[in-house]
Amino acid sequence: MIAHRPFIPTLLLPLLALTATAQVPEAEPTLSGEMTLSQCITYAQRHSPDLIPARVQMEQLEVQEESARMNFLPDLNAGVGQNFSFGYTQGHDKVLRKNNGSSTGLSVSTSLSLFEGGARWWALKSSREALESKDYILDEVEDRIALTVASSYVGVLLAQQIVEVAEENLSLSLMQQKRVDAQVEAGKLAPSEQLKMRTQVGQDRLALNEAKSDLDRAMRVLRLDMGITEEGETFTVPQEDPESVIARLERESPYHAAPEWTNPSLRLAQLRYDLSSYDVKRAKAGYMPRLSLSGGYSNGYFYYFGDEIPNKSFGDQLKSNGQYTIGLSLSIPIFNRGQVRASVRQAELQRESALGQLIQQQFSEQRNITLATADLRKAEESYRLSKDNVEVAQESLDMTEKEYNAGRITAYEWEQSKNKLIGAKSQYLQSVYTRLLRSINLTYYLTGTLPR
């Protein structure tokens, strides 16, 4: 991530469990023991396969910039040729003589483009600006990876708490089963009530097994989002009390954060529009004449077979056959079947398309902020309602427990009250971690900070 981004809000610090200061580089995370959200994201941003296309694209920008610079240098070419000729020639005395021989030619030539309508200059300027902004390509991918891993990580935290609720549910059912068994033995309840309770315990065991399976699946999703495919590489996610998470969220709200940054996706859209303007100028350079400078040196050696024509020595021929050339070439476009005009129009259409994409990206950023704000407010309201619901359900179960012990209600009514409490706790946990994830998203959209 680029250096100008602000630090992580304090509401995320305990969740991330950062152990190093901002001045100390973070060590390479290893897949062992407990891994915090920060470590999971750091690992994913170094090992995710999503980084491969971004790195290739960044390398392509470097190659394009180097190629644009090299276009200002002259061309240098060397050539060598060997020819053989056979036949007769007629001299001044009307006599035919054999003219069989060979010729060897050597040449070195160079050319330099002096003016091309500014095409090379615009290409260089475009490639340099693209290269200077290459970090945003990596930032965009890293941010997407971080948001994905954060969502998966929060999913694991929620799944862990759901398992605890399922275990509590089973524990209550087992306790109730013992009481029902005792009442059946005492003749206070029919044996059918005992069978009903056993059925309920079996259902609660199944619910616990499903909760553990969901936790295992959530861990697998997190591993895949981190780029981990080897089954032997294991780690765990530390559990945290939901109320401690809410306490931190209450201390710092992202609502008042000023959007003082620009999303990498928006910067890339702006860059594509700026570069498209250079493409239009490069295309219009095709209307301009082209001036080039060329020069060269050539030499040759001739050898005649036979005695009819005497051969000069190799050294004498090199002294007398050498030739230097230098010249200017001006090419003025007159008619090229409308190719330049078509290229200009195509470049202008691409610029209009890039402008449309930029406007769409700007709208998308504002839309994300608006919806993220609404989602967080909804999550906060759901949290408050679900918390009140848990308190009411717990109070109801306590009262039901007393009435059941007094013999005023049946085991079925007690079971109904217990199920309402378990359902209320599940909704409460869902609201807690939904609020946490919504807070992470809104903080990112407003400030660009992400768990690192």
Q: Can you say where each PLM-predicted feature lies in the sequence?
A:
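Periplasmic alpha-helical coiled-coil/stalk elements that build and connect Gram-negative outer-membrane
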Residues: 35, 144-260, 375, 379
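Sec/SRP-type N-terminal targeting helices
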Residues: 52-56, 69, 100, 114-142, ...
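Bacterial N-terminal signal peptides that target proteins for export
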Residues: 1-11
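Short segments within alpha-helical structural elements
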Residues: 206-228, 390-448
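Bacterial N-terminal signal peptides
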Residues: 9-19
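Small/polar, glycine/serine/threonine/aspartate-rich low-complexity segments that form flexible
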Residues: 24-33, 79-112, 240-247, 281, ...
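Short flexible linkers and secondary-structure junctions
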Residues: 24-155, 291, 295, 338-341
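Bacterial Sec-pathway N-terminal export signals of envelope proteins
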Residues: 22-77, 81, 230, 237-279, ...
